[in-house]
Amino acid sequence: VRNAYTLAALVCILSTPVYGQDGGPFADYDAGRFQQAESGAEDALETDGQNPVLWALLAEARAKLGDHANAAQAFARASQLASDIDARSYYMRAQALQLVNAGQHAEARTIIAAALAEPSLTAVDTLDWAMVAIAAKDDAAAQQLLDDESVYQGFTRQTALDAAYSAKRRGLDKRAVRFFERGLVLDETETERLSDEEREAIRREVRELTRDWSFIGQVSYSTSGRSNTLGALPQDDQRAIQVGAEISRRIGGWRNGRPFSVFGRVYHSEFLDDDAFADDATQGWVGVRYKPFSALNLNVEGSRLIGLDRDGIDDWSVRAAISGGEGIEPEFGTSDWSYSQFYGDISYLFDNDVTYGIAEGRYGRAFALGNRSTILTPYGFVRAGLDTGRIQEGSLGAGGGLALRHWFDETDTTAWRGFIEFDIQARERIA
């Protein structure tokens, strides 16, 4: 949803004389003759230079002509001359907004700070002040103004959503969720409703902001041909099953896309053949994870490995993982769409001096089944692996796969929070 800002219009009952034979600059402005209105206001100010309404008219005309910097100067003069608090409040908001339109955000924030220092100014049309602060990229001031819950009654759909994104940027997760949900409710009363895609984007924001706990479970079965580097071992397939789970807890919330989490993880690997070349093992991890960039799904973690049986290991590990893609979640307006996904993961074990790495890229086509909660995705992929503890450290393979994913646990304001997926792959070693 595109951010927008609103500014309430001030209705002035003017007692000033009418200038010019055509009804004066006010009539020119009302008729859309903004150049004439600007010229007329300038002429009038030569004889009535202390009139704040004329300065405001000049400012409005310049704003319509796209001369935002000079419009801001005229609004500044109007606010200096105005004695009425409502008028001063409006003129200062308008000045800040014109500075924003002129690209002078720092100067706009200076005006907002001056208004906050005089509470009687921001007590007038507080919600408008908050929207101007958001436009000026001053989320701290905006959220300070929005501490006054009485202004929420004045929310429109757009102002509620703008306030939500601002609160999210400030790390005020609960407030952001409240505003997002309010915006979705207010959308029901709008003539031009949000599209399905826009509503879903907001529901996904709510999901991310409310997700403090996470649980991942996995069961996998694989067969793989043994490499010739293993010497005398038979060359038939090796069958293995792996079962694992991870639970994590965010500390401090979403942090505007930079969450910090603690986690625990347990995996058990079982080799099913009598001549297995590796022993069964149960391995545990406890650690911390941090996402340092809000716009990039890169996670770094540090953990302690704990052997939970005689074949598990005790060690310290650092790890980095990155992922992304398109078409991973259900899309709207179509029953099928392009799917792409990439994943990279590299970790290092200090005591064992071993590096592990995996990189995989997928491309395919996703098909929605039923009510869009179930997605079938055939895809092709390329996969690379690294294990410095092996004789042949690197590997490269490619193949095809089929994934069936069912999403569940959604509400009117929160997107699907969980899924179950069945994924089968066939791949051939390339190198």
Model-derived features with residue positions:
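Transmembrane beta-barrel domains of bacterial outer-membrane proteins
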Residues: A56-L57, L127, A135, T156-L172, ...
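Alpha-helical protein-protein interaction scaffolds
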Residues: Q21-L209
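Bacterial N-terminal signal peptides that target proteins for export
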Residues: V1-L7
